[in-house]
Amino acid sequence: MRLKEQIAILALGAGFAACTPKPPPHIIEDNMEFAQQQLRFAFDEIDYAIVNESPESREKREKNGWGELTNPRNSEPDGTLNLVPSKDWTSGFFPGELWYLYEYTQNNFWKKKAQQHTDMLEREKVNGTTHDMGFKMYCSFGNGYRLTQDEHYKEVLLQSARTLATRFKPKAGIIRSWDHSTARWACPVIIDNMMNLELLFWATKESQDSTFYRIAVDHAKTTMKHHFRPDFSSYHVVDYDTITGHVLKKNTHQGFADESAWSRGQAWALYGYTMCYRETRLPEFLEQAENIEKYLFTHRNMPEDLIPYWDFNAPDIPNEPRDVSAATVIASALYELSLYDAEKGQRYKDNADQIMDNLTKHYRATLKKDNGFLLLHSTGTKPTNTEVDVPIVYADYYFIEALMRKNKLEKTGKLF
């Protein structure tokens, strides 16, 4: 560990009680109790949605071989719960929430529920049509293995990593994202893909196969080279020629415009490079994460409550929808980033605490309503008016993860 990091950890541990603005006195306990009650209600909502699935939805699933409905994704504007099969990129977040509740409570009720909702996803370990293996498998099986050391979970994760590695394009140095939209892109890579690298780093340590490490580092370095503008904002989509490795175009899919800063994309980048630094200790990854953080928190359009609008360049700010999911990802990333810089660490944690305080006070769902989700006001894909200003499962997952990180950090001064 570098001296700078050791000083950062000591300074944080000593300074939390004296320097940190005090959030509500029991923000962790209050939110975790709320989460337990709300997710118990969510099980009833899930059962109801399965029983009342429309014939059209069932026929479409069966025709395409998508399998059974597994986990919640979002609330629709009319209040109905949208459940997804395992193939959906969001299918791993709900089981991940359950594993965190088991870790926090040590109550076997949550362990059994987590196992049930995790096991539904096993078929995805050989699904080579997607880059989202980290989201789906590491949030679910990864948390499960961390807490249980179940050898079967380990094998599922290793196979998932092997499957993800098949999407690596060595000439370009990237992991391909989507297979769709071939008329628009040859080999698209989205900034979200930084989040899937943690599975590869884990697989390196568990298998002693450095191939996974090299793929993850190559992808992170190539993304750092081509996805970012001089101000350290990120493009959403970069398209590559897999033969020459050259960049073909830079676009957006979920942001306001090609040259805008889609908020959740910036959050994925912050989290991804913070994690990459943890796994590699390469200083360029820490520098990248800190530059992204600086971009976010000095941006003129960052709201006072630190809950971003869906795009930092959206045309009708302050009347644009917020994206709570971006805020939860940022908060979770900041708790980790606070460990790695002695001078800025306290500020990073203070900002994370402010985000969590404001989410708790102003963005939380109503108990035993809102389909059992924890947070309101996330935005999925505004350009197509999909999942706009609704509860979305990944906002809840990173909210609980941030609470767990805050709890560990304040009790032990470390996270891992």
What are these regions (language model features)?
Residues M1-H26:
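Bacterial Sec-dependent N-terminal signal peptides
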